[in-house]
Amino acid sequence: MTKPEIREPRAERYNPHAIEPKWQARWEQEGLYTFHEDPSKTKHYALTMFPYPSGNLHIGHWYANVAPDAHARWMRMRGYNVFFPMGFDAFGLPAENAAIKHGLNPATWTSSNIEHMLGQFKRMGTMIDWSRSLATCDPEYYRWNQWFFTEFFRRGLAYKKDGLVNWCPKDQTVLANEQVVDGRCERCGTPVERRNLSQWYLKITDYAEELLDFRDTDMPERVRAMQTNWIGKSVGAEITFDTPAGPETVFTTRPDTLMGATFLVLAPEHPKVPALTTPEQAEAVRAYVEAAGRKTDVERQQELGEKTGVFTGSYATHPVTGHQIPIWVADYVLMTYGTGSIMAVPAHDERDFDFARKFGLEIREVIRPEGGEPLDTTQAPYVGEGVIVNSGEFDGLPGGKASIAPIIARLEALGVAKPKTTYRLRDWLVSRQRYWGTPIPIVYCPDHGAQPVPADQLPVKLPENVEFMPTGQSPLKLDREWMRATCPVCGGPAERDTDTMDTFVDSSWYMYRYLSPHDDQHPFDPAHANLLPVDLYTGGIEHAILHLLYSRFWTKVMRDMGLTVQNEPFARLRNQGIILGEDGEKMSKSRGNVVDPDDLVREYGADTVRTYLMFIAPWELGGPWDPSGINGPAKWLSRVWALYFDEKAAGPEEKIGEADLRYAVHSTLKKVGADYERMSFNTIIAALMELTNTLVKAKRSPVFGTPAWEEALDIFNRMLAPVAPHIAEEIWRERGGTESVHLQAWPAVDEAAATRDTVTIGVQVSGKIRGEVQISKTATAEEALAAARAHPDVAKFTEGKQTIKEIYVPGRIINIVVK
């Protein structure tokens, strides 16, 4: 026989500090949120981007997590088998820098932070399954980073090359292009330098075209646009010009303007620059190339002043006319786009026009507005598509896209051009010269070169006793013993690669590892692949062209490796906004506008903080923190408590019937369900608050104590559970529930009860609202106006006055105009 549960006496007033720790401990003890696969249920994999273990969850973490938690709880109550894991993105520079500052090993600092943040997450009251938790700094995790790297290497997707890279002088490490924002390090804000280094890259460009296909993932339009722009597909032609240093191929999206090309421009880094530079120009070119090398690509593209450049002294031969055109070097041309050289058409390109005006170069019109007169393109370029002119056999053809194919075909027949598609996307630079990251699993043999570490020797663990002060070279180079290795081909001595991987490698596939976080045979157990893809992924839009693009690339490689059948890691992505400081600025310690959620929980309880963060603003937009705003949700939850447990409701008796109450309950239930579908959390809270007002009135009406009243309390309790899980659980158990409210089914909408044959509309007198009337939805204009005239609050403003006009907008408004 089951022992009856011993309950403590119920508190008369709502006390979250007594309720919340009790239920958090109980849920954990009972394993309420532990995921178990159940083929009889439809799976729902819900995932929120995992945090960096900085030491404390800030209010932004709460904002990012509580709304998706409510959504996951709602899905579970609807009968879905919800998988909702969480872990920690634990490698990276902040841990290394903090460890340097405090004289700790990064592993010690990170582990302590994870332990603290885990407790904070639990006090948030989430339904996270912590049995699947992971930390990317654990060797059992980064072993698979290394395994993937070796597999990418074998497939030709990981390679090493020399080249100009972005260098952060403060963090003393290389940055990927995506980590440079406005010429500065994304993390620390330091101006970025350019250095020539040998680095490892992943060949994301092999998947550029496929990454432009979003058919298998539901992403916000803004994210799709950002990724599309970053990939930067351009369709055009490669055209070859003869030069003294051999043929030079340029890429253009406007082959229709070829006859207007009056000079070539090469990037300062272009390998032909030395050979094309004449002795007379050698010193000027050398100085210019050196100066350009001190600028980042972003700075070169964004400079608003006069164009700069230098003449090489050499000329190219125009492939059609045979004319000699000068070859220049200018830093507005990038080696990383196209071929690193352009044909300049100053009459029809703004940058080329500015350059030609600056240096007195020829400007030749070859495109004219359709039906228009010749333009003075020496004063301003014409960049429209127009009609081709001054171009021999091409004259009269439409400019732009319409003529690309026939013009390329003709140039191809002449042997000077071919069709070409290019992408702005560059391969992903993954080498980092810091300690706290995944060691790159490559050894270097004098006889066999770079060789991947065999799978049975993984993980290559980080050495523990290393001096990791930033010096510009990897700290791993300081551990000579760790560097010693054996060549897997010949068994001879070899040396380890001493760089570590970009931490975005860690987060590119972590959503798969949750399926079996302790599996030592596979990155993830294929037996659990039925949980894929992630059904709902949530996080900040700031990751649009970093993490979100890299994870899509990683999934496509995994598919080609036979590890998954998915084309995309996420079926649906939604982004939350940002909670700003009270001053409307981004929260930061230096501004003194940081809100500590732990302080709020100590004062108000987790349920109040949860509901306020869902109520404060549309979730996808965010907004400024209002310190007084949290009092509203706090008072609301106290009213909810009183609704269930106070004997009487103060106030005059209300006239609410069963049909009225059931309409309020079921119409709210229907609205809340629709709002969960569109993730409109602020309107969910607003609807529940409004229903609370109705229930408080109903408690003072004849409907109190009836079956309709009991149904209302039951449904409201279950609607409350996803947003305020602790108070909802306490109410449920106090009302006799033997199982958790979080194991209950979401209530079914009674469509008949949720629909009314009548409608309540406002009545205006001379444009001002004076009352409301309830009329049939099919009422005629005369019936509606008669009801309005009879309303006592309306009659006070119409009696003794002349009626000028009466207006009835069916179902919307009545207006009686008097004088």
Curated annotation (Swiss-Prot):
Localization (cell): Cytoplasm
Residues reported to bind ATP: K589
Reactions listed under catalytic activity: tRNA(Leu) + L-leucine + ATP = L-leucyl-tRNA(Leu) + AMP + diphosphate
UniProt KW Ligase keyword: yes
Pfam families: Anticodon_1, tRNA-synt_1, tRNA-synt_1_2
Gene Ontology MF terms in the entry: aminoacyl-tRNA deacylase activity; ATP binding; leucine-tRNA ligase activity
Keyword annotations: Aminoacyl-tRNA synthetase, ATP-binding, Cytoplasm, Ligase, Nucleotide-binding, Protein biosynthesis
UniProt short sequence motif 'HIGH' region, positions renumbered to this chain: 51-61
InterPro entries: aa-tRNA-synth_Ia, Leu-tRNA-ligase, Leu_tRNA-synth_edit, M/V/L/I-tRNA-synth_anticd-bd, Rossmann-like_a/b/a_fold, tRNAsynth_Ia_anticodon-bd, Val/Leu/Ile-tRNA-synth_edit
GO cellular component: cytosol
Motif ('KMSKS' region): 586-590
EC number(s) recorded for this UniProt protein: 6.1.1.4
GO biological process, one term: leucyl-tRNA aminoacylation
NCBIfam families: leuS_bact
Protein family per UniProt: Belongs to the class-I aminoacyl-tRNA synthetase family.
Protein name: Leucine--tRNA ligase
Organism of this sequence: Deinococcus geothermalis (strain DSM 11300 / CIP 105573 / AG-3a)
Upper classification of the organism: Bacteria, Thermotogati, Deinococcota, Deinococci, Deinococcales
